Amino acid sequence: MRISLGLLATASAAAARSIPHPPQSGRANCVQSLVPVHASATNFNLTGLDPTKPVPLKADVPVSGRFTVEVHFCAPTARRAAHADTLLVMAPGATYNTLYWDLPLQPETYSFVRLANSQGFATLSIARVGDGLSSRPDPINVLQLPIQVAAQVEILKLAREGKIPGFRGRFRNVVGIGHSLSSAILNGVIVEAPQVIDAAIFTGYGHADPSNMLFPTTGFGFIPANEAGIPRFRNLPDGYLTTQNITSRTVFYGPPGTFDPDVLAFDEAHKDTVSIGEFNTLFTSSVAAPRFRGPVLTVDGAFDTSFCPTQACDTLAREAQFYPNARSVEFVVIQGSGHDLNLHLTAPGFFQTLLSWIVRHGF
């Protein structure tokens, strides 16, 4: 996967546009913005491919464009000198937006952002291109993993340089945290531009067979977003998908008793989208990142059957081979959790696991 990274001259704090605070971020310590970036990548040719008949993909389609990315910056609510120069940058998985890391429902339990801020960390929650208030480009030919990687690299560059609205200077340490699809994107980031972050945390993720195979979008509870009966999706082009209903959304959860039904209902009411292009190139970044030298942590839920086929989740032990020069490679299995670790009753313990790891590694 070859990616060319170019920063648009106007993509700075001056060019970024602050927008009204939504309920989950309407706090004195938070600023929500739309940040323009220019990204270029070599995408995959998906023309004429049948997702029911997977075939190897070929990257030979140059793509370049200007995209707007929704970001939420929150300053610490407690002063901790040890963490003053550290920024945590989080991104959500498929069909999620910035709410995933900062849930307004029972935030004392389900908001990683609030907990991190209370422990002295600054946070930047970003919506992938294609979800939230970010740009929604062609969902098949443009919105694929390579362009997502390129766009995220640009945001991380701006973040490190202190050029995001709300920032009061540069950050010496940047910790990237992804969930699911955004973990795949984060892996691509440390393959292509390992210098933009100092530590990588992957959640709801594991390296798949890197054979560049199409991901079947049929039969997994996904439907065209513009047919979901949701007003905010009505005018989206064909190729944007979302989950069909609350029942299909339970695939992201563990068995009953591991989550609050009110959280699932909130999740269904505020779900977002994913593109066919993202799905069909999901596994293309499942490659080694030999140039990344920071610490790596992978965390999965014991009930996440996609990455933990057994309760022991022993498949995570093989993750170390993909980061041969990392300072350290660790993995943690959260018992009692499914794929969406943030939305289970075990969320507080999971969040503290991440923060304790970050502190232990000197950030």
PLM-predicted stretches and their roles:
Residues 141-167:
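Alpha/beta-hydrolase active-site loop
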Residues 1-18:
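Fungal secretory targeting signals
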Residues 301, 305-316, 342:
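Conserved alpha/beta-hydrolase "acid-adjacent" motif
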Residues 78-124:
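Short, surface-exposed "cap/lid" segments of acyl-processing enzymes
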Residues 327-363:
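Catalytic active-site module of serine/aspartate enzymes centered on a nucleophile-bearing elbow/loop
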Residues 292, 298-300:
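Short beta-strand/loop motif that positions the catalytic acidic residue
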Residues 19-83:
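N-terminal cap/lid segment of alpha/beta-hydrolase-fold proteins
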Residues 186-271:
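Alpha/beta-hydrolase-fold enzymes
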